[in-house]
Amino acid sequence: MAAITAALVKELRERTGEGMMDCKKALEKAGGDIEKAIDDMRASGAIKAAKKAGNVAAEGAIAVKTDGKAAVLLEVNSQTDFLALQDDFKNFVAESIEEAFAQKLTDAAPLIASRESAREALVAKCGENVNIRRLVRVEGDVVGAYLHGNKIGAVVVLKGGDVELAKNIAMHVAASNPEFLDASEISAEAIEREKNVFLQLNADKIAGKPENIVENMINGRITKFKAEASLKEQAFVMNPEVKVGELAKKAGAEIVSFTYFKVGEGIEKPVDNFAEEVAAQVAAAKQ
């Protein structure tokens, strides 16, 4: 049995939104296996679905630049959304993405190094910490990108088709955040877990039903799971009557890859305790 650490309880709480004690009990029951704990909580009806790991809010901006053959996605973080809306921060982000694209950088490390002086100057001026967090560069036959409000960015690489198609699929990715490119990428383990959760959640409904009926119900749930999780199987947001994979195929294109960035994924933002803050200010005033 894995140790039930505070960090593990905290992660489960962030992924499910449930209380600390409920998360601790679920982990103890699951022997410290966080994925099993999530499945058990779903099966018991405690939660409808687990949030993706690290889905914690933070501030900043996503930037994207493409020329139709390559694209760069960049995330720069700030402590507050107020700063993210200011021209000084926007200029820093714009200059950073331009440099990253021009230098054909494939990760954030060299950009962090070259932009350090500019970052320090921005921090000194605004009084907030600013960090270049991550960067991805993709190249291909056809590359399209979409940016939603500087908070979500997506790029799609196609073989065949055109930039407009790639951009439209990138828009879909930004809206739907698929987990997989194709249903074939979904592991047998993930499918088996989904099946077990379904059986536990619907134990009363399937009790006494013929085996073939139960099998059909399971297959229906797995088909829905695959459609929800894989890009090619999802209904296209601009025309739900067609799947994304079919859309690309009709245009003579093949979806090679996609990348999705959302500001703050995986970053824990401190939550201020207003009562403690007031108490601290009162205590300081008495000194």
UniProtKB/Swiss-Prot annotation:
Positions in coiled-coil regions: none
Keywords for the protein's UniProt record, in alphabetical order: Cytoplasm, Elongation factor, Protein biosynthesis
Highest taxon of source: Bacteria
Region (Involved in Mg(2+) ion dislocation from EF-Tu): 80-83
A GO molecular function held by the record: translation elongation factor activity
Location(s), subcellular: Cytoplasm
Family membership noted in the UniProt record: Belongs to the EF-Ts family.
Protein name: Elongation factor Ts
